[in-house]
Design a protein with these regions (language model features):
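N-terminal secretory signal peptides that target proteins for export/translocation
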Residues: 1-14
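Blade-terminus and WD-like Trp-Asp/Gly-His loop motifs, strongest in beta-propeller folds
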Residues: 463-467
Length: 531
């Protein structure tokens, strides 16, 4: 080794020794930082809470060469699941509740339909809502193929415009199928009852029922049997929304008002036209027939194209969300969750994120009594976060209860939050655990609206109930007609018992101390009416 190499080695060793000494002396002077309880809770929350821990996605394998753009589902008497496609076909899935994923499960039942967007089964017939009518079909010879097709009701018209979809409900308690009919394009109605909801009766009548429809994405019922549909951002719709359908009501878009003369016997006189550029609750106070949106879905936050509707009537087989509604979004490829209540006789409520990561844009949803949520989708003609062209999937509850805001309810001077699991008292009663913003949308004939009239209501107090499942928030500055965005990033659960982790009795137990953060910290309440 040369003298130069020896010198280099000695210099490196000296530098390393000095660095070690400096580190050691610094450690003696400054002890290692000890995490506070709040920091520990924050660190823990980053490691847990994935949606897939609670709701697993099961994907079906569609036969090769088949583009099954699933729009609606219906259980058949033999246990098979009928699934309709935008491409005019109806397929049957064998053993739809199993973990099996094989193309052999699928068999085509019918074809030649015109974009079917709703199905139900009654008295040996599969009823199908398609673009021009409600039809019923059946297999008479038992070969697994539909061979009899009958038109039940067709009292509306079509022009060929691609917007003119027809979404059909299940049978209501009176035996009617509700059909929501898209306008001709976004702004007008060039064919009879376009921009209306109608009811197809068992004896073949078409009853004009509700005006003001723009561009529906789905239709369904809540646990009480009341009918709702989703409408999408556009003229007279600042953002996407969930709306309550009732006879003789108007739900927002005046583009179909020209048909009141034909509907006079069912609907009465035409309502007053809304003022362009107003706010929707200002107009609701002026127009008795106008029923404002029950829930507004903030555009770009909760989705961009609200679609299919399902209600959890499984009595706990889908987790803690009994009787709540679920709404798909085509653009975001997600399923949202909704809780509603009646205030002054009107439905209103909150929406929450629920499950993302579906294969393509969600269109069809169906909740089964066994707690299986079937999901279908497409992205043909529209973009979606999910990259596949179509999908047939199912959401299964894993048996674990997520720590979530179960409900956000309006109370005098604020909101009550109900949780799925007991909440840590210190975080629940610390007002810094919460923040709130409010905003609304312009009610206008132009396409959509930005968020406007923004405010920041102030949370003045937070009180936890004795069972640790409810928090009462008193808030200054609530705004009628606004979406109230609640952010609860500081909330922590009480330390959980093993039984609660398995989904048993979420209201029981719960020792002192902090557990996990909320799976989803955001809730959006549409405050139309004050209690």
């Amino acid at each position: 080794m040369s003298i130069r190499s020896v010198l280099r080695s000695r210099i490196r060793a000296s530098v390393a020794s000095a660095s070690l000494a400096l580190f050691t002396s610094a450690s003696l002077i400054a002890p290692i930082h000890s995490l506070t309880a709040q920091e520990k809770a924050g660190a823990a929350s980053k490691q847990e809470a994935k949606e897939s821990d609670y709701y697993a996605i099961h994907s079906f394998e569609v036969p090769e060469g088949v583009e099954l753009e699933a729009t609606s589902f219906q259980r058949m008497p033999d246990g098979k699941m009928a699934v309709a496609s935008r491409r005019g076909e109806i397929w049957l899935i064998e053993n739809p509740d199993s973990d099996k994923a094989s193309a052999e499960q699928f068999k085509r039942f019918a074809h030649g339909m015109h974009e079917p967007l709703g199905m139900d089964y009654r008295d040996g017939w599969l009823y199908v809502t398609q673009r021009p009518d409600v039809s019923r079909i059946r297999d008479n010879d038992g070969d697994g193929q539909a061979d009899e097709f009958e038109v039940v009701a067709d009292g509306w018209q079509i022009t060929g415009d691609y917007h003119e979809y027809a979404f059909g409900s299940k049978f209501d308690k009176d035996g009617n199928i509700w059909v929501v009919l898209c306008l001709t394009g976004s702004f007008g109605s060039d064919a009879l009852y376009r921009g209306w909801a109608v009811r197809a009766t068992a004896d073949g009548k078409t009853l004009p029922t509700t005006s003001g429809i723009r561009s529906p994405g789905g239709i369904g019922m809540n646990a009480a049997g009341d009918v709702f549909y989703t409408d999408n951002q556009g003229p007279w719709n600042g953002t996407c929304a969930l709306k309550h359908l009732m006879p003789k009501k108007f739900v927002g878009h005046p583009g179909g008002f020209k048909w009141y003369e034909q509907a006079a016997s069912e609907m009465g006189a035409k309502p007053k036209e809304p003022k362009d550029g107003s706010r929707f609750m200002v107009e609701a106070d002026k127009i008795p027939e106008y029923e404002p949106p029950a829930i507004l879905f903030p555009y770009g936050k909760m989705g961009q194209s609200a679609a299919g509707i399902a209600c959890d009537t499984s009595d706990g087989k889908f987790g803690p969300f009994k009787n709540q509604m679920f709404v798909g979004d085509q653009t975001f490829s997600t399923v949202m969750r909704c809780s509603m209540e009646k205030v002054q006789g009107h439905y209103q409520g909150a929406c929450y994120p629920f499950r993302e990561g579906l294969d393509c844009g969600v269109v069809g949803l169906q909740m089964e009594p066994n707690g299986k949520l079937f999901v279908g989708g497409t992205n043909r003609g529209w973009g979606s976060r999910g990259t596949k062209s179509f999908c047939v999937q199912r959401l299964d509850w894993t048996g674990k209860v997520p720590f979530e805001i179960l409900e956000m309810k309006a109370i005098k001077g604020g909101f009550e939050l109900v949780f799925t699991q007991p909440v840590d008292r210190a975080s629940a009663e610390d007002i810094s655990s919460y923040a709130m913003k409010s905003f609304t949308y312009i009610y206008q004939g132009a396409y959509g609206s930005p968020e406007v009239d923004a405010t920041e209501p102030q949370i003045k107090s937070a009180k936890l109930s004795s069972d640790a499942l409810r928090v009462e928030l008193q808030i200054e500055g609530l705004q009628r007609g606004h979406v109230h965005h609640l952010m609860s990033k500081g909330i922590r659960s009480a330390v959980q018992t093993s039984s609660q982790e398995k989904g048993e009795s979420p209201g029981q137990g719960g020792s002192q101390g902090q557990g996990r953060g909320l799976l989803h910290t955001d809730a959006y309440y549409t405050l139309n009416y004050l209690p």
